[in-house]
Every structure is written in C-alpha cells, then in structure tokens.
Amino acid sequence: GRYVTGGRGGNVYHVTSLADDGSEGTLRWALGKSGVKTIVFDVSGTIHLQSSLDISIGNVTIAGQTAPGDGICVADYPVSIKANNVIVRYMRFRLGNKNVLANGADGWDGFGGFDQQDLVIDHCSVSWSIDECLSVLGNKNTTVQWCLVAQSLVNSGHSKGAHAYGGNWGG
C-alpha cells in the first residue's frame, strides 16, 4: 500500500456532526460524495451508527487525526471498505454486540475490506466485535500499520458459542 494516494489533491469535506442520518456534515454524507476526497473532522466523540457503513466510493482519505480532543470513534455497526484507493487514519472502531444480537448478524466484523486494492489502515484501533475485529482478506497492495486490534467479545452471543478473533487477514 505504499503508493496509495487516497484523496490526495481532491475536495475536502468537513464532518461537523456526530449524527448518522446522512445529512450534510455527517461522516455518512461525506463518504457518499463522489470524486477524489479527503474527509476531516471538526468534532470529536463517538458516531453511533444507525446501520452498516460502507466506504463504497474510492479515492478517499479519512483523516481521523484532524479531530480535536479525544478523536473519533465509530460504534454499533460494522464499517466495510468496498472500494479501491482508501486511506483510513487515526480512527477507533467499536462494533459491540447490541445491534449484532438484535439483528442476528453474528458474522459481522468491526472493520475491514475484502477483495479490494490499494488500502492503508494506519493508527486505528478496532475492538469489541463478536466475529473478527479487523478483517482484510483477498486484497492487493494493502498496508495495516501501527494499529491496535484487540479485545474481541468471545462469549457474546455468537452462534458458534465462544467465538471471536482480533484479526483475520491474508492475500
């Protein structure tokens, strides 16, 4: 992933709200904008997702290090990379088990991407998931660096019983 450009040279979108309703200023709104982009944060705190969040438009940098104070945490639903040329830096992901159990979706991973290329996940922490915390499989040119992937919820309602893993990655 050393040649990944993410949103370099594109538009800059500011996250000004911790809401997850897709309105202007939310992370969901910014991720839905087309074109090359960098997403910066003017707020800090936890974004409690109302549904799964897909990074489905590539050529994006999510710059969590721009958040003031204690930074940004994304919680309650999975975040999935479904595009190429994506950089995610200085973010926290906490799936938890509240919505997993309510939706009967014990295969959810906290964060990750499958079968993509040109990804960088840097200085992120991913924990409290009941399947895998971070899954990065079948990708090309992918770097996961300086990340903390830990504390899966082993006895938290998975259909296989005591089941949970920190990470799951490979080519």
Please give the residue ranges for each predicted region.
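Intrinsically disordered, low-complexity segments enriched in small/polar residues
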Residues: 4-8, 23, 43, 56, ...
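Right-handed parallel beta-helix
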Residues: 48-171
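A common structural microfeature
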Residues: 10-12, 36-39, 44, 59, ...
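Generic N-terminal helix/loop capping motif
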Residues: 30-37, 42, 65-69, 94
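Acidic Gly/Asp/Thr-rich repetitive segments characteristic of extracellular carbohydrate-active
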Residues: 1-39
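Active-site-proximal beta-strand/loop segments in catalytic clefts of secreted hydrolases
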Residues: 17-18, 42-44, 65, 129
